[in-house]
Amino acid sequence: MTLLKHEIKMNLKSILIWAISVGGLCAGCILLFESLEESMKEMTDAYSDMGAFSAALGMDKLSISTMEGFYGTEIALMFALGGAMFAAMTGAAMLSKEEEGHTCEFLATLPLGRGRIFFWKYAAVVLLVLLFNLMTVLLILVGFAGAGEMLDGKTFVLYHGAQLIMQLEVGSICFLISALSKKKQIGACLGFAMVLYISDLMCRVIPDLEGLKYVTPYYFSNGADIFASGEVQWGMAAAALVVMVLSVVAAAVVYQKKDLAS
């Protein structure tokens, strides 16, 4: 528990910056929607003629001239990218920073085995992702309160639940990368999160690449799909949870056998 508290304290500044940036941007866009509503109606007509581009961004399912459509396409995209990048960055640094910073020897002096250190490190990743989501969603709700509008509660919860699963999957895979590396691979993990997003776009636009939807967690957590259908593809969400568990198990095996640099 002491190690968990230490990690939360060390990452407090980072999580505040990310949560306020992502949540504040989303809330600000919600507050701006009323003033942009008329121009959004004109943009809806323009986007409807853009074929594959509209399909990639979900504008063939939702109208951005409505609050639900605007949130499900524009704001959901900002939240998804911001959340995945935060999860990737958090997972990427959690284990490897000890080797890079030559603090493994200090950890070895604590009355904790590798198994407990690993457990509390991963618990810190999960808790940081949960705190990020809590803070950003609170800011988003403040935005809705200020705008005097609110989306369907069930769909809103489904979307953010799917996003949480997506972020935990990305964070867990990057946690595995952290276990494999002696240095923080933050750049590579941020790039990995972006590649997953690009894969989601490509599988929606290029029929031959449709199989990528089974690879990228952005597909089942896509805001436009969830707000248009009112449901989550739970089969894919369950597969994401399996990938998450396998990543953590693999990371544990690697970490237990690893020759840690002091």
Protein language model features and the residues they cover:
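Aromatic- and glycine-rich beta-strand/loop motifs that create alpha-glucan
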Residues: M1-V22
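Transmembrane helix boundary and interhelical loop/hinge segments in multi-pass membrane proteins
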Residues: A88-A108, Y122
